[in-house]
Each structure stands twice: as C-alpha cells, then as structure tokens.
Amino acid sequence: MHSMREKTQDECDLLDRARRLVPMLKARTAQADKDLKVPVESVLELQSAGLLRALQPRAFGGYEVDPRTFFEIQTILAEGCMSTAWIYGVMGVHPWQLARYPIETQREVWGEDHSALICSTYMPAAQVTVVEGGYRISGRWGFSSGSEHC
C-alpha cells in the first residue's frame, strides 16, 4: 500500500500561485512561439511567485518542496504554456542540484541574494585555466535552456 503525506502550506501556496499564472502564460503562448523563447515577463512572474525557489533549501530562502510537488507545479504551468513549463523545469531543478554541493558553494551563490537564478549545460566541452585573480573558462555549449534569464 502506498500512502502520500499531506502537503505543507508552502506547497499548497506554490501550487495556487502556479494556477493563478496560467491565464497570463496562456495569453503569451503565441508570442513565445513566434519569438522562439519564453517572454521575460513570464520568467519574472515565475520568480516573483517564488516558483523558481521551490526546490531551493529553506536555509537559503527556498521552500524545499518534494519533487512530486515540483512536478505538479510544472504540470500546472504547462496548462498555460508548454515552453514556460519546460523552462521552469530546467531552471527550477538547478537549486536542487546546487543543494548537493558543499555548503560553501551554496553560500557563494545564495549567501547575499536568495533570488539568484542558476543555469548550466549538461554537455560542456570546456577548458578551465587558472589565471591571476581566478579562473578563465572557455569552451562551446550548444544550448542551455533558460540561460538568457539567469
């Protein structure tokens, strides 16, 4: 037998916020299709609603929801705009990935700004060189969905 736990108030609130965005996302779908990118306004609404911090640790201003709730949010957003739901899924999972890094790395990213957005590419072909004052990273990346919003 499989039992499901009750949703937290934060999870319920995030799901409600996602539902409230659906009409606005739907209204921009044609523009997103025409421009071949998610409108900046849509990403700002995701951010303003706290949805991009759904998987972010509470210690850094996130909601630390379970993956099931994260995917429920994504499914709701898809009712408004599939492209926005895709971007949400890609951008929204990065806080979960960063949460697996050492705490020092998390502090470096979220220490002063809990709203910092993260992007990455899953197929990097790069070279890292130590230079005076830090590192130089050069390489080629075919794409990184959502990177223009980070």
Regions found by a protein language model. Give the residues of each.
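Glycine-rich flavin
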Residues: V40-S48, L52-C150
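Alpha-helical interface subdomain recognition
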Residues: H2-Q56, G62-E72
